[in-house]
């Protein structure tokens, strides 16, 4: 059984009579005829293997995978409570994008909203196409209402990822979907169950969450989510509605369902695509063999549960019981503070053996004791427990080091904001940093709130982040799979974990009261966001731009359509006031 999503717009509180499924996921790669795939060597990427080829240097296949997305407002009831949402092609989660390593992905985005938008392709490196990264005010202007923009970029890494809006906190309302890039096989398996997307759920629109965060009560943190979802589904007890809340609601909404074949090995692609919460994931009675973190294949290791911050992914193999019968429970749980604002509802899904079909089947399986015991632990395994499959050494002595102190403080009007070295971020949608840099403008003394760190032509960069604020934070860097050199509490002592082959990720956890040290080779000229992936935190200023090799950015021939997108946006803002309540991202 493939991953399930809610589809269509609901004019009344009903669930769709048919829940559409993501297409069957092939075990190896997608087949095409124009041009012919696979190549004579047997794979779309030729004779390369996971052992002998750099995972960020694909063979270009010449195949274009085209998609057409319409983004519009709607209403759905993911857990039985009807809510306003923003949807991609009337689906939640949005459509699956699927490609082979080295294919070109092309997505035309039509903005049918009454506000701007832009889509970001999480963890794609965008080498030589940084203007396709999809971050308004940084790599492009927002797509104006009624306008469209076509993103074209190479599937330059392989594994599991996702796309989402990067305009304000829109994606928390539903503008997101999974991406699968087929690449080198590492660990064999028999069946691919596809994406399993974990997300916290707010019953109110994202704008209401932001208004609460920035209102006169000077909230330090957002209100906790109302529920938690697996592939867009869970149930909710409608008797918990606030007094006077007349929103249509029905308890016992259907859960997501999956099916295991006895004795077979199944690949599960787990993604945390929520707005805020760290997720604990497990499957009762079945251990998880981890084979990839983010877009990085790793030497396989076995666990009973996973811990994923927002933006993080893990590919795992589950071997079904040889004589398995009945139904088991899949669990996604939001841990309490300091990991997240606690919520009193876990997400569950049903995993069947045999021919069980009832959506409301009860599972009698029990959670792993280790899963229960670890609910108060915010981070996953220590970095020394994870070994990338393909070894890449960290820069021996990075050319430059930047220390960033993260704090939480009130601004002049009393609102709590995050500060990066005493500067809270705010974007200017009308003047994308990448386009300014392309014109030779790399200094912004009149706009310190842009938080641009110009690293010049340095060939390697180390960033040391200290968390003097609240909570553990999932830190995401665009344009790179960075080396996680060290993570810990207190002050960094200068030690680098496994410098010959450190953990590589695009999103890693910065602990409360601690530090995270990352480094990367500066081989990708661009304006790359570095930010907390909690939607409400980046909305509150937890963000900087890494300006990498601006001398080479000036040499880019940026397509004219990027400029036209700005002209369309400027035309829209000439007669419409943009209510930028937050940082803009």
Swiss-Prot record:
Q: What molecular function terms (GO) are annotated for this protein?
A: copper ion binding; oxidoreductase activity
Q: Give the family from UniProt.
A: Belongs to the multicopper oxidase family.
- Domain Plastocyanin-like residue range list: 71-184, 195-355, 431-551
Q: Which Pfam families match?
A: Cu-oxidase, Cu-oxidase_2, Cu-oxidase_3
Q: Which SUPFAM superfamilies match?
A: Cupredoxins
Function of the molecule: Oxydoreductase; part of the gene cluster that mediates the biosynthesis of pestheic acid, a diphenyl ether which is a biosynthetic precursor of the unique chloropupukeananes. The biosynthesis initiates from condensation of acetate and malonate units catalyzed by the non-reducing PKS ptaA. As the ptaA protein is TE/CLC domain-deficient, hydrolysis and Claisen cyclization of the polyketide could be catalyzed by ptaB containing a beta-lactamase domain.
Do the record's keywords include tRNA-binding? no
The pathway it acts in is:
Secondary metabolite biosynthesis
Key words, A-Z: Copper, Glycoprotein, Metal-binding, Oxidoreductase, Repeat, Signal
**TM segment ranges:** none
Query: Its Enzyme Commission number?
Result: 1.-.-.-
Q: Does the keyword Repeat apply?
A: yes
Instruction: State the organism named in the record.
Output: Pestalotiopsis fici (strain W106-1 / CGMCC3.15140)
**Chain positions carrying an annotated carbohydrate:** 51, 237, 323, 355, 362, 405, 411, 422, 441, 458, 574
Q: Where is the signal peptide?
A: 1-20
Q: What induces it?
A: The cluster is expressed in rice fermentation medium. Three regulators are located in the cluster (ptaR1, ptaR2 and ptaR3), suggesting that the production of pestheic acid is controlled by a complex regulatory mechanism.
Traits of the deletion mutant:
Does not affect the production of pestheic acid.
Q: What is this protein called?
A: Oxydoreductase ptaK
Mind telling me which Gene3D superfamilies this protein's record contains? Cupredoxins - blue copper proteins (2.60.40.420)
